[in-house]
UniProtKB/Swiss-Prot annotation:
Stated name of the protein: Terephthalate 1,2-dioxygenase, reductase component 1
EC number: 1.14.12.15
Function (record text): Component of the terephthalate 1,2-dioxygenase multicomponent enzyme system which catalyzes the dioxygenation of terephthalate (TER/TPA) to 1,2-dihydroxy-3,5-cyclohexadiene-1,4-dicarboxylic acid (DCD). TphA1 probably reduces TphA2A3. It can also use 2,5-dicarboxypyridine (PDC) and 1,4-napthalenedicarboxylic acid (NDC) as substrates, and preferentially uses NADPH which is the physiological electron donor.
Family annotation (InterPro entries): 2Fe-2S_ferredoxin-like_sf, 2Fe-2S_ferredoxin-type, 2Fe2S_fd_BS, Beta-grasp_dom_sf, Cbr1-like_FAD-bd_dom, FAD-bd_FR_type, Flavoprot_Pyr_Nucl_cyt_Rdtase, FNR_nucleotide-bd
Species this chain originates from: Comamonas sp
Superkingdom of origin organism: Bacteria
Domain 2Fe-2S ferredoxin-type: 3-91
Binding site for [2Fe-2S] cluster: C37, C42, C45, C75
GO molecular function: 2 iron, 2 sulfur cluster binding; FAD binding; metal ion binding; NADPH binding; terephthalate 1,2-dioxygenase activity
Gene that encodes it: tphA1I
The organism's taxonomic lineage, starting at the top: Bacteria, Pseudomonadati, Pseudomonadota, Betaproteobacteria, Burkholderiales
Thermal properties: Optimum temperature is 30 degrees Celsius. Approximately 60% of maximum TPADO activity is observed at 15 degrees Celsius, and activity is completely lost at 50 degrees Celsius.
Alphabetically ordered keywords of this record: 2Fe-2S, Dioxygenase, FAD, Flavoprotein, Iron, Iron-sulfur, Metal-binding, NAD, Oxidoreductase
Needed co-factor(s): FAD; [2Fe-2S] cluster
Catalytic reaction equation(s): terephthalate + NADH + O2 + H(+) = (3S,4R)-3,4-dihydroxycyclohexa-1,5-diene-1,4-dicarboxylate + NAD(+)
Domain FAD-binding FR-type: from-to ranges: 98-197
Amino acid sequence: MNHQIHIHDSDIAFPCAPGQSVLDAALQAGIELPYSCRKGSCGNCASALLDGNITSFNGMAVRSELCTSEQVLLCGCTAASDIRIQPSSFRRLDPEARKRFTAKVYSNTLAAPDVSLLRLRLPVGKRAKFEAGQYLLIHLDDGESRSYSMANPPHESDGITLHVRHVPGGRFSTIVQQLKSGDTLEIELPFGSIALKPDDTRPLICVAGGTGFAPIKSVLDDLAKRKVQRDITLIWGARNPSGLYLPSAIDKWRKTWPQFRYIAAITDLGNVPADAHAGRVDDALRTHFGNLHDHVVHCCGSPSLVQSVRTAASDMGLLAQNFHADVFATSPTGSH
């Protein structure tokens, strides 16, 4: 039996089927709620539950330390009755926005010893409609899929650029190293909610770990295209300098924004350049900033990295609603 999900202070209601998460039900109904990892790690989908009952979805936690006493994780629960929720934001999706394409490999190069820079081209006359920071699914022949963030900005819509880290034993990590020009992949996009607002002028701190740089590159290239002027800092962390694999992007942003600040964070303490921070990205945040009350932080990386940065930012006065996360969480259906 389906139950109805009502969004507080709106006329929006949608059905939630048995065995379906509230988040999936919303997306199926064309309603976008904040989300990223869909595995309970990022906390983006936390929403107040005002009325009704829920149960766990597929054994997932319905709450985490990121939730207030009133909140539940919409990716981790299903409706056990009609419920009323109050998400931090919502919007109606364009039902025609999400598309599936057969994309061709245009080029496949190594950006770092363990990172492939994969450029895809869409069929002639087709364009990918997405927003900076969103991700796509790569559908594999066996029915599984893997998710990766678009690294190119939305105005470069005739193709897609992905940054793929080679994970030992990873399903797509093995495939990507064998792909050559002309090979095809089935892709579907876009996925993911957008937290950053292009018209926001508050100081922005972007924090990335490894290939968490990909969605941040899309965001910053988009802001540059829009000629947005704001104080922007990028903290990019890797084990060694080779993991900071796209210095040309940094150089371009320095020319775009004279006030742009870049902090490289290297954890291999025996291999730290003179101009880099020795340590983790959360350590770099604490070292180079004071009070963050008036800032916005956008963090992309592993669950542990995101959590450590979230804790540091909170300790430094950042308001919870000004921390936006894109968690690269490994799952049965893939990871960014």
